[in-house]
Amino acid sequence: MSAEERFAQLPRAAMRKSRAILIRRYLLGESSLIVHWCTGDHGLLKTVARGARRPKSPFAGRLDLFFTADIAWSPSRRSDLHTLTEATLVAPRLGLRDSYGRTLAAAYFTSMVDLVVEREAPVPEFHDLLGRALDWLDSHEPTAAAVRRFED
């Protein structure tokens, strides 16, 4: 039996699903993205969205900063970079792009979460806090008091 046949017989990891907030994304080659998510039940996740930059991609318009989406991914057996298979937009938070201050505050909040949350560990309280903060910023200008409250 060849190595490919043995590999094909290995059990596949079950697809996982979660509601997630997109906190970071990078280009990968000409057509793909590496996307970082904050989820309540799986912590911080890194996924690769293959072909996401193609015009007819199923991910078109669904993978932008601060978006909340219901995602599905296939876990990797070799690394912490999983394969994104689905993304259904839940909350685009378009108001965050209305002013530089809102965008800056949202970026600060997501970077704080990225620094303090453990990879692939359940963190529902941080996911909820970030979601509420981004929802508030979607319709309000940031204040020093709001930033301090988030930090506390």
Regions found by a protein language model. Name each.
Residues 2-152:
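Non-catalytic alpha-helical scaffolds and adjoining flexible linkers that form interface surfaces
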